């Protein structure tokens, strides 16, 4: 069975893969923005924005969002990579509209209140601390920074404590305007669904998302650094060795 693809008039792309033998649907909103698109003043902002999408809209608080998905019996979450940001949900097939409408409201109508920013700032800083204290994660970051020095690809997706500590309401609004538009979004779904119905629902719930073409990526060629790189990190109570090569 092949997949179906439709590009809406506002530039948004809808892709579906019908699977009539199942009774569930996996739905994802894929934004073409990752940590590689950040400049030196935005380190970690892509990931921070992912967190902020769950912190409330003009009509719903974070608990309302969570309870909405809980009532659907849905799994929902998000993740940020170097290449893209994804918001997703998995649910039984007759809850497609309910899940899609809430995901749309989250990414279109988030309010970015200063109170939510201050709260989530501490959450992300703690996430950075956990990553630094996890050998697997830390080695991966050492590898990236050694392989792509002085380049966005070499920086951690989570950002740094220093940069995360500076983000404001205006930073979030400006980032949202630059990257969260129809031309930068792919709505993809697989499961027991009809493509034409999915397109109709996306048209209905994303009509308020501003039109646009794909945001041009600020691409630069990284200076690849080959060879063996080693680092010894001392932590209490005993030292641990990390190496990337």
Task: Tell me the role of every PLM-derived stretch.
Residues 11, 47, 87, 103, ...:
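Divalent metal-coordination and catalytic microenvironments
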Residues 34-37, 195-196:
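Short beta-strands and strand-coil junctions in structured, solvent-facing domains, enriched
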Residues 44-57:
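Active-site SXXK
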Residues 110-128, 194, 214-224:
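Acidic/histidine-enriched alpha-helical segments
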Residues 183-189:
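Short loop-to-beta-strand entry elements in the cores of soluble alpha/beta enzymes
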